């Protein structure tokens, strides 16, 4: 999963972390049938936390050798598991097929509140290649420092640009520069700040 380079010695190599075995099950390099290798990760200063696009769980490693899996499945998505992509068919068709499947996007660590944000993209029949697909809805799964799900919020399409976001002292900022948003202005970069709301027990 990761490569390393020692800038003092010039040594380079690969870490011992590997994709889950399910990703190697039916790959066929001869006939170009491969899994989507998309990976997102964040670092807490102690652990590297890994999210795969077609995998419900996240993986945590403190030594780049051993990993522990934690459930991070969206309640809005069906079970996500690796689907083979056929490299012999049209790229656009492959993208449309993938767009209909449960999929996880980026993973972010909030050092101020010690939580993680995992973005889940809702399946959509109208995914277009080379587009941000502004109509697509998404959700954000929130996990605590022990990698337990503590909440999830769903966001509508045509409102936010989920790929434009960052963590600040006040909360999670998500851009409203969605081209389908009625308030969209290409001359202004607008973000909305979202904060955690804890329910009283």
Task: Describe each region flagged by the PLM.
Residues 138-180:
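C-terminal structured domain segments
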Residues 54, 122-124, 178-180:
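Residue-level signature of beta-propeller blades and closely related beta-rich strand-turn architectures
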Residues 1-11, 55-59, 131-149, 186-200:
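Beta-propeller blade signature
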Residues 1-61:
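Loop-centered beta-sheet repeat module
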Residues 11-34, 68-99, 153-159, 167-168:
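Surface-exposed loop and turn segments in beta-propeller and other repeat-based domains
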Residues 97-145:
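Loop/turn-rich, solvent-exposed surfaces of beta-rich toroidal or solenoidal domains
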Residues 30-45, 99-113, 165-169, 178:
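Structural signature of eukaryotic scaffold interfaces centered on beta-propeller domains
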Residues 48-49, 116-118, 172:
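Hydrophobic beta-strand positions that form the internal "hydrophobic ladder"
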């Amino acid at each position: 999963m990761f490569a390393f380079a020692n800038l003092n010695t010039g040594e380079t190599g690969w870490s011992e972390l590997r994709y889950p075995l399910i990703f190697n099950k039916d790959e066929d390099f001869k006939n170009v049938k491969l899994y989507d290798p998309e990976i997102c990760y964040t670092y807490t200063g102690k652990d590297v936390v890994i999210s795969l696009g077609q995998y419900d769980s996240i993986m945590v490693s403190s030594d780049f050798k051993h990993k522990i899996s934690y459930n991070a499945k969206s309640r809005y998505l069906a079970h996500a598991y690796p689907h083979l992509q056929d490299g012999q068919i049209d790229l656009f068709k492959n993208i449309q097929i993938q767009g209909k499947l449960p999929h996880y996007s980026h993973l972010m660590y909030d050092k101020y509140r010690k939580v993680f944000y995992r973005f889940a993209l809702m399946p959509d029949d109208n995914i277009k290649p080379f587009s941000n697909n502004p109509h697509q809805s998404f959700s954000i799964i929130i996990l605590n420092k022990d990698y337990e799900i503590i909440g999830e919020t769903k966001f509508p399409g045509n409102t936010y640009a989920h790929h434009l976001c960052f963590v600040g002292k006040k909360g999670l900022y998500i851009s409203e520069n969605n081209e389908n948003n009625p308030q969209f202005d290409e001359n202004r970069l607008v973000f909305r700040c979202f904060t955690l709301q804890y329910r009283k027990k």
